[in-house]
């Protein structure tokens, strides 16, 4: 287990399963808002951090938000399908892109709850070899691209045992796929 100390002095324990750094390229489709995170970062900049825009879209508002703003909007990272998870061609990114569905090692939140699971508990305690698909992702902060009729869904990735990590895959009903390795703070396009 790795211990990280944050700016405010809180300690975050991160499981070894919580790290994944796949090779990436620059997205030709999307760009995102990027804030410099430190003790000087304002709430407005933090709230915008990670928001995704089409490559030809003009952000409104656009940085700088204030005289000392260090935010930028720049092309986001992209990862090739099959590399977005640790599972290669057996991974959720591969299956969603090629088959339009998750692989068989996924269990719905409802089925997981029927086994006795509750938030904060390890799914592996109730069923081995399965990852959770949590259903619709509401995109409450609006960071994922929005369009009329677009619905987002979410599922765990790179989870094998113990407490769930911060890795998720989100996909839309119209074919967009992104992964996050920091629990929705930032996203990477799956191409």
Predicted features and spans:
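Alpha-helical interaction segments
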Residues: 20-23, 85, 107, 176-178
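N-terminal "domain-start" segment
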Residues: 79-128
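General secondary-structure propensity
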Residues: 57-58, 95, 175-177
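Intrinsically disordered, low-complexity regions enriched in Ser/Pro/Gly/Gln/His and often acidic
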Residues: 23-26, 87-88, 110, 145
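Functional cores of ribonucleases/endoribonucleases
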Residues: 29-36, 43-46, 115-191
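Activation/maturation switch segments at domain boundaries
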Residues: 2-84
């Amino acid at each position: 287990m790795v211990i990280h100390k944050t700016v405010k002095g809180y300690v975050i324990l991160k499981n070894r399963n919580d790290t994944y750094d796949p090779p990436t390229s620059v997205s030709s489709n999307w760009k995102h808002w990027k804030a410099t995170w430190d003790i000087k970062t304002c709430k407005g900049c933090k709230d915008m951090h990670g928001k995704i825009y089409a490559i030809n879209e003009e952000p409104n508002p656009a940085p700088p938000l204030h005289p000392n703003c260090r935010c930028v909007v720049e092309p986001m990272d992209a990862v090739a399908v099959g590399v977005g998870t640790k599972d290669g061609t057996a991974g959720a990114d591969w299956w969603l892109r090629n088959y339009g569905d998750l692989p068989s090692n996924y269990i719905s939140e409802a089925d997981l709850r029927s086994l006795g699971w509750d938030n904060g508990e390890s799914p592996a305690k109730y069923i081995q070899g399965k990852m959770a698909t949590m259903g619709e992702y509401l995109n409450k902060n609006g960071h994922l691209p929005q369009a009329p009729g677009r619905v987002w869904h979410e599922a765990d990735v790179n989870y094998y045992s113990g407490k769930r990590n911060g890795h998720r895959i989100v996909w839309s009903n119209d074919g967009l796929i992104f992964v996050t390795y920091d629990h929705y703070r930032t996203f990477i396009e799956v191409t």
